[in-house]
């Protein structure tokens, strides 16, 4: 409930433009170019960070992007978990949704999911047996705590059948080592005819990369086929260059971060501190009186409040949704309380007490059912972030 109050009130405070009310619907006007400080205020409220510092246009058709798009669609449509017909380490290509039951458990328990697209190492030679891929882990928010990370490599049927069984191993290149030393991270046994995703636990490795971002721009992994002379290409492993297949290797990381209210409190403290330092230690001036933006209805009900990312000039890095209804509750809780007000027995008693003793407070029109907002955005050209804001939308209102 606090999330709804803070989110709605801060949206009002972020703009000096008057809102228009028609039929209890508060509509955002055509957005005019605002000062940078006001644009950043909107971004900070939704915890979307700064405008991404990307060097190239992100690819929405690779496997990393498609995975998070599938997650977003499942969350947004409130679909029931689908039955997965294959084991976690060997998913079928026929299963268009790349999400397993284990994934859904992590999705339900985390509030941020990030995918990291892979790139082929620039020095990679066509005749090399091993595959060298790199990952960009910059621009990940420092207040996120990693829970689990998985590397996913897609395997097609092998081009040669001289080895019915072989092992795929993943190694991490050690930092600042000139002798090209690698440390093994994990192995998966497979067959020449196998088609599906191979997965490797990369939790400790990704956590190390995130804690040591300054060591190198990109982090390298080496994928090899056991002790054989079989190349990863001949074994059927899809490389980052195989853009037509949309099955490139990628990392998915499940994170937990602080609640939105905690972030807003830290943001306010930081800004108050900056103002005091700029003003020589004097306290900040009192805030301006609140502006009456609308005339509330007579009775408690839910009112619309549309947030449009294009009008906020954020559509270039917010992938989905393009806009959403935040809603808020408004109106009075006056006697008699009708059925449409969803009044509790306590609210009815409190209303009667207020009639007899006016100094006692009346019930308040508040959210009774809360929903979540899910936002999908770029962090840079290689990383996509899905963040869930729990209890941030007023689904129903009532007198409490």
Swiss-Prot record:
It is found in: Secreted. Keywords: Cleavage on pair of basic residues, Developmental protein, Differentiation, Disulfide bond, Glycoprotein, Growth factor, Secreted, Signal. GO terms for molecular function: cytokine activity; growth factor activity; protein heterodimerization activity; receptor ligand activity. Residues 1-16 form the signal peptide. GO terms for biological process: amnioserosa formation; BMP signaling pathway; cell differentiation; digestive tract mesoderm development; dorsal/ventral pattern formation; gonad development; imaginal disc-derived wing morphogenesis. GO terms for cellular component: extracellular space. Glycans are attached at residues 165, 189, 201, 304, 342. InterPro entries: Cystine-knot_cytokine, TGF-b_C, TGF-b_propeptide, TGF-beta-rel, TGFb_CS. Disulfide bonds join 300-365, 329-397, 333-399. Residues 17-277 form a propeptide. Its main location: secreted. Pfam families: TGF_beta, TGFb_propeptide. CDD domains: TGF_beta_BMP5_like (cd13761). The keyword GTP-binding does not apply. Belongs to the TGF-beta family. Heterodimers of scw/dpp are the active subunit, dpp/dpp homodimers elicit a basal response and scw/scw homodimers alone are ineffective in specifying a dorsal pattern. This is Protein screw. It comes from Drosophila melanogaster. The gene is scw.
